[in-house]
Amino acid sequence: MSDDNRIESMAARLREAQSSRQTIAPLREACPEGDATLAYAIQQVNNDLRAANGERLVGRKIGLTSPAVQKQLGVGQPDFGALFASMAYGDSQPMPLASLVQPKVEAEIALVLERDLTAEKNTFADLIGATAYALAAIEVVDSRIRDWDIRFFDTVADNASSALFVLGSRPVLLRDIDLTACAMTLTQDGEILSRGNGTACLGNPLNAAAWLADRMVRLGTPLRAGDIVLTGALGPMVAVKAAGTYTAHIEGLGSVRASFSE
């Protein structure tokens, strides 16, 4: 089978898994020689279809920003996926569990850009100058791969295991906050389920954002004004078992809530 046929076939398998809410075997089993280029090509097929169907691209998410997770998956870099407007929910707006497969939540810092990032090598100064503000965020990650049995190839192809996201409503200028010092707690009904801080995200969320900005320029699709960037998890992700509300509090950025309904 040619690479083009394999790309189309695996992209279709992921779409079917999402529409049926039935997980599939790891894609790497069908393509053991698959590399990052092939995985991103699979992701792009499905992203292009979403755009062709009228969905609006609003930004990017960065994954694998934890050194421990990178080691687990045998990679030395993060990955990225696409964010569409259809994936965005408001603070406390109910998200139907029936639309998800095996969801988990993680607390993150989101950056909203006000300028394009077109330099081949972006500095912290470039990022700070291009960012309108930061927000607390919760990403709902989900995997179409059975039992979350993923490696780098699987998660990249699966839009970096992204599903939905919720942004907080307290915009903060980067000059007014130290992103590395942002302590995070993720709770449900007052029980702390996850803790972390900004250093968990490649040492500084701006490191992750710089990596993404450089990568997107190399791909010919630079980050643009208005884009949302989810910079990566500040602590361990938490499986969503049933309907309920998860609250992420990030010091300096306030709180944001992800609510799930049956």
From Swiss-Prot:
Keywords: Aromatic hydrocarbons catabolism, Lyase. One of its GO terms (molecular function) is manganese ion binding. The keyword Calcium does not apply. Its EC number is 4.2.1.80. One of its GO terms (cellular component) is cytoplasm. SUPFAM superfamilies: FAH. GO terms for biological process: 3-phenylpropionate catabolic process. Pfam families: FAA_hydrolase. Its cofactor is a divalent metal cation. It catalyses: (S)-4-hydroxy-2-oxopentanoate = (2Z)-2-hydroxypenta-2,4-dienoate + H2O. The keyword Lyase applies. Pathway: Aromatic compound metabolism; 3-phenylpropanoate degradation. Catalyzes the conversion of 2-hydroxypentadienoic acid (enolic form of 2-oxopent-4-enoate) to 4-hydroxy-2-ketopentanoic acid. Belongs to the hydratase/decarboxylase family. MhpD subfamily. HAMAP family: MhpD. This is 2-keto-4-pentenoate hydratase. The gene is mhpD.
